[in-house]
């Protein structure tokens, strides 16, 4: 089954990046700016894997804050940092926090094979372009799928910088969907399956 959906998590739609991360990591997180606590630990049985992928050339502060401690703790720091940065923006009322992807994983692949697939895809498609990818795999009732939250601002030596407008191009969604099919099909072939996911265009969802 091919499923690849992209949307933006924004303040204008009433969403919280920290709450969204708490749901994905099936844990309890606190949004520093609002003080709101979200606890999704009751969903822990669905969580199969969690990881944060950063660019190879990421500044030291990114490594220190988001590649240390537990993944859930690093995720909480990451999205609190993002919300704090957007809170300083002149357009904070319409702040855009993250790009969210939901991707169906081939059921033919093992857990380790799915993890390797996601690592390769996220590094090549997003991290190598400068984004941080906070991702998890949920698996319940034989429905393995990945949730990904991507940062929207470029990384500077001392913090998040300007929003990277190139990442908002509508053409990106078509490219990402095509690349996912290519990566997944390669993983299936290497696992010994004569199967292919077919990339079929869907009505384009605006990325901004």
Predicted regions and their residues:
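N-terminal nicking endonuclease/strand-transfer module with a His-rich metal-binding environment
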Residues: 1-208
